[in-house]
Design a protein with these regions (language model features):
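Generic extreme N-terminus detector
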Residues: 5, 21-22
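Bacterial N-terminal signal peptides that target proteins for export
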Residues: 1-8
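A generic "folded-domain core" signal
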Residues: 22-172
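Bacterial N-terminal signal peptides
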Residues: 8-17
Length: 172
């Protein structure tokens, strides 16, 4: 869990998660599971997180993180990076993904979080993505900042994805 500690803290702070009742960690394949429950509402705010397959040690601004997190609107798909991206006029970045050797659906606009160092997938795409990811072995992610064209690309192992995800859903 040490290799994910700083990224997990970043995700938690990005969502301004106050009043966390408990946090307990476990690992399934390439994924860490972090359990969080709001003290007052009992809402599930748990998440799973993985780092790129070529991740060595220490977080760098040239790495992406891949996460799925329970929020008030349900299960969210997130990509995290370690530097400021300007985004477009709607605070979005271009995200392209590819599962195994399947064709990529092409670049999509994902809305950035207020930190400008993470973005989430549009909710109407999440269920199809999850269904496809459950049967895949790898995920390639590319994030491009439309402001200046800066790009970060990483590949992730999806080993343990289904098991880890099943540990945090349903998101209630």
């Amino acid at each position: 869990m040490n290799r994910f500690f700083s990224l997990a803290i970043f995700i938690l702070s990005s969502f301004v998660l106050l009043n966390v009742a408990f946090a307990q960690d476990e690992t399934h394949g390439a994924f860490d599971v972090v359990y969080n429950q709001d003290t007052f509402t009992d809402e599930n705010r748990s998440f799973i997180l993985t780092m790129p397959t070529d991740f060595r040690s220490g977080w760098s601004e040239d790495n992406l993180g891949f996460s799925m997190k329970c929020l008030a609107d349900g299960l969210n798909v997130l990509v995290i990076w370690g530097k400021f991206f300007g985004g477009d006029r709607d605070d979005r970045v271009a995200v392209t993904y590819r599962l195994d050797d399947r064709p990529s659906p092409g670049p999509m606009r994902w809305t950035m979080l207020p930190s400008s160092e993470a973005a989430w997938m549009p909710m109407h795409l999440v269920n199809d993505f999850v269904a496809e990811a459950r049967t895949a072995r790898t995920l390639a992610l590319r994030v491009t900042d439309p402001l200046d064209g800066e790009t970060i690309t990483n590949t992730f192992s999806l080993e343990g994805f289904g098991t880890a995800l099943d540990r945090i859903i349903p998101c209630r």
